[in-house]
Amino acid sequence: MGESPDFISDLPQSIIENILTRLSIRDAIRTSVLSSKWRYKWSTLTDLVFDEKCVSPSNDRCVVETNLVRFITGVLLLHQGPIHKFQLSTSFKQCRPDIDQWLLFLSRNGIKELVLKLGEGEFRVPACLFNCLKLTCLELCHCEFDPPQYFKGFSYLKSLNLHQILVAPEVIESLISGCPLLEFLSLSYFDSLVLSISAPNLMYLYLDGEFKDIFLENTPKLVAISVSMYMHEDVTDFEQSSDYNLVKFLGGVPLLEKLVGYIYFTKYLSIGDDPGRLPLTYIHLKTIELYQVCFEDADEVLVLLRLVTHSPNLKELKVSASPVQPFPLEEEGFDLFERDYFDYKLPSLESVKITDASGIRYELEFIRFLLGTSPVLETVTVSSSLSDKDAKMDMVIELLRYPRVSPRAQLLFLQD
């Protein structure tokens, strides 16, 4: 009998490459035993992803770390051709001197995507990283870096993600402005940072940290913004500016489609002298999510009103009330909804979700406003933070009394 055909060895190169790219690097290397033709097929992979699962588990972390270093070094030594992506996720610290050598190797191999997710403690990024001028994506976690003076930026970088990075504020700003093609920017766990962002092609912005101030100086193409902003309990330092933060932060983003804000973000937007109407109508804005809004603060409620009334195509609104009570409501603030807001129409609003409602005046008035100005509204979902059943029932009865301009509008009450 003749030998059966060796289908594995005779697979087209494109199919072999497709198979290898779907495997972990460890399993890809194991394909070397399939046949002599497969022995070094893995060595031309352009995307290399490493983590602690690349080596056999052991109760001795030192053994695992040593094996991981040897594994990565061996892969790089045997690799042939360009490396487009290199990703390392590890909590080990002793391998950090080896990372310097790996980055030097990568800087000479046309690396385009670099991801370093390291454990606690800052890893000082070597200068050779800034020689990786073909980078299109850079993600660093628990690192420290200070670019050399000759560094002018990454001309091709489109995505920048920095998580818990030790770096001077001016370095961040210089890095961002030195990436003219940047489309995605994420900065998280930054403390006491005054940040100016100039990125003419930026489309997606995610910020998480204790920012003192944020300036969007040149971001005309932004379509999505998400900000988690933390402040000290004493916010007097943030009350000094006469510029209205809502205008300062959102005054130059005409293409905005989605806005999400957490913690003190609405408070931050409310600071400064309100100019009246906003200078910009957000015709593309379809989703607004603002969490932990203090409905006892008339200025924060005004931010909500300003945003929804200047977003004619808004479809979805999510708001959570702040569980804290920072100060009593001033009586003169009660005329907020007696202005001309009920002359507005929200022609596209379909879905509203209010969470952690406690039934205070401004919460109820805001819901009444939405019901009375949204002709295509379908659902208003309300969940309450009240523990007293009678108080909760009073709130429900009050809300059911409000007129609705949409014949399809439904009020749904959920138990927290």
Swiss-Prot record:
Top-level taxon: Eukaryota
Record-linked SUPFAM superfamilies: F-box domain (SSF81383), RNI-like (SSF52047)
CDD domains listed in its UniProt record: F-box_AtFBL13-like
InterPro entries xrefs: F-box-like_dom_sf, F-box_AtFBL13-like, F-box_dom, FBD, LRR_dom_sf, LRR_FXL15/At3g58940/PEG3-like
PROSITE patterns: FBOX
The entry's keywords: Leucine-rich repeat, Repeat
Swiss-Prot/TrEMBL LRR repeat ranges: 115-142, 164-189, 203-229, 238-263, 294-321
Residue span, F-box domain: 5-53
FBD domain span: 346-384
Name of the featured protein: F-box/FBD/LRR-repeat protein At1g13570
Lineage of the organism: Eukaryota, Viridiplantae, Streptophyta, Embryophyta, Tracheophyta
